[in-house]
């Protein structure tokens, strides 16, 4: 836990969680603070000058969830998905920049593909992982390797035998 003087710039709501975005005196930069993690707020009554170049829409343009800003570089991401997931992504895109690749660009095995220009934030990676084996990252290679490391970590976790005699709470 730490204290900072925060000059508030905007509030972001994502996945039912509120984020307070502002200039943090401790960090000297714009930061996002999940409201559920803020232990105490005190209004100092001080005035501050809002940065002229801050625009909330631009700050979050390439992200999903609560992460935003220049720390997270946007990359062009291509995924191949099952037909079931494709139907879902057509109705609820992963990101506003999402476009379905035309038939001439279909994956070798005929799976539908989608492209998007998005920041590779932890919440975006978690969203991709939530589709399990029904979504494959084709590009960029760095994201593909990250997904493989996460898959290996899951395999290691679940390969460890646990007693089936454990009693679960009712």
Residue ranges with predicted function:
Residues 61-170:
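Polybasic (Lys/Arg-rich)
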Residues 1-78, 83, 169:
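Core beta-strand-centered patch of the WYL/Sm-like small regulatory domain
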